[in-house]
């Protein structure tokens, strides 16, 4: 077997060329999702599947969010109906424990969800932190995000970010609702109040989280555990049905809103 020889400078140039082509492309998006956990990946999967240009920024060098930790590091988590339909769609094996309740392998879950998201057309970028948003007035709207290398922030270096535009920004950062928290603090006219999440009550938390997922302010959406933080909903522990269904609902809301905005714009242009 003869292995193709590639020198170091070619390696560098090929990587830089492909990388900058990507960054030039996804500097403008339909949807930017912050956080590659279960809700973020689900939102990205369904957004990309619908043909929306979708980019996911994940501050870590991995994806899956809380999936990988399983339940207190045990490698299994619970999924309930109807979220099992999403896992069947992407080929995750389900172990049935009772009607509508299943246990899945955490590694398989996050690997297949990420692969399905990429195959649907979404771009996932690791090692990038979103630390602010872009906004516009008249009408007031969130129109993108400010991004920085996670390593730069960890090193406490004073470096300005770059900016990425999006018609919809999704906060899927988990319990801290980091993007919405920044927007709430720095753009008070958005009128966002963050009461904080409540202690565990899984029987009601799953339903409430899905129902309350969606647009928080024009152009800004909440998915997954970020919803519990901004809506004072209880936490639910290692049951992940709501995370998937929340991401799917947010994607559906974005698709509907962007279609409505597009129709309005076309109507105005005709007039």
Swiss-Prot record:
Swiss-Prot/TrEMBL GO biological process terms: thiamine biosynthetic process; thiamine diphosphate biosynthetic process; thiazole biosynthetic process
Catalytic activity: hydrogen sulfide + glycine + NAD(+) = ADP-5-ethyl-4-methylthiazole-2-carboxylate + nicotinamide + 3 H2O + H(+)
Positions with a binding annotation for NAD(+): 39, 58-59, 66, 130, 158-160, 225
Pfam families named among the record's database cross-references: Thi4
Binding sites annotated in the UniProt record for glycine: 235
Gene3D superfamilies in alphabetical order: FAD/NAD(P)-binding domain
Keywords for the protein's UniProt record, in alphabetical order: Iron, Metal-binding, NAD, Thiamine biosynthesis, Transferase
Record keyword Magnesium present: no
Zinc-finger among keywords: no
Residues binding Fe cation: 160, 175
Molecular-function GO terms, alphabetical: iron ion binding; pentosyltransferase activity
Pathway annotation from the record: Cofactor biosynthesis; thiamine diphosphate biosynthesis
InterPro entries (UniProt xref): FAD/NAD-bd_sf (IPR036188), Thi4_fam (IPR002922), Thi4_prok (IPR022828)
Cofactor: Fe(2+)
UniProt EC number: 2.4.2.59
Biological role stated in the UniProt entry: Involved in the biosynthesis of the thiazole moiety of thiamine. Catalyzes the conversion of NAD and glycine to adenosine diphosphate 5-(2-hydroxyethyl)-4-methylthiazole-2-carboxylate (ADT), an adenylated thiazole intermediate, using free sulfide as a source of sulfur.
Subunit structure: Homooctamer; tetramer of dimers.
Family, per entry: Belongs to the THI4 family.
UniProt-recorded name of the protein: Thiamine thiazole synthase
């Amino acid at each position: 077997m003869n292995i193709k020889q590639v020198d170091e400078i070619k390696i560098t140039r090929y990587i830089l060329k492909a990388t900058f082509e990507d960054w030039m492309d996804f500097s403008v998006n339909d949807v930017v999702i912050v956080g590659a956990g279960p809700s973020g990946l689900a939102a990205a999967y369904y957004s990309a599947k619908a043909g929306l240009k979708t980019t996911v920024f994940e501050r870590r060098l991995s994806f899956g969010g809380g999936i990988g930790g399983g339940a207190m590091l045990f490698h299994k988590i619970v999924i309930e109906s109807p979220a099992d339909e999403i896992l069947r769609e992407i080929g995750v094996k389900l172990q049935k424990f009772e009607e509508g309740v299943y246990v899945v392998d955490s590694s398989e879950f996050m690997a297949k969800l990420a692969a399905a998201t990429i195959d649907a057309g979404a771009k996932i970028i690791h090692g990038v932190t979103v630390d602010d948003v872009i906004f516009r007035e008249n009408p007031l709207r969130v129109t993108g995000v400010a991004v920085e290398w996670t390593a730069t922030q960890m090193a406490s270096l004073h470096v300005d970010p770059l900016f990425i535009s999006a018609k919809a920004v999704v906060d899927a950062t988990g319990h801290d609702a980091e993007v919405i928290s920044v927007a709430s603090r720095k753009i008070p006219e958005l009128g966002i109040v963050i009461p904080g999440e409540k202690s565990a009550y899984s029987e009601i938390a799953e339903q409430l989280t899905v129902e309350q997922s969606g647009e928080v302010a024009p152009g800004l959406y909440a998915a997954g555990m970020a919803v519990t933080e901004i809506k004072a909903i209880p936490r639910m522990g290692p049951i992940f049905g709501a995370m998937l269904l929340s991401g799917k609902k947010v994607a559906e809301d974005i698709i509907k809103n962007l279609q409505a905005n597009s129709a309005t714009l076309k109507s105005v242009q005709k007039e």
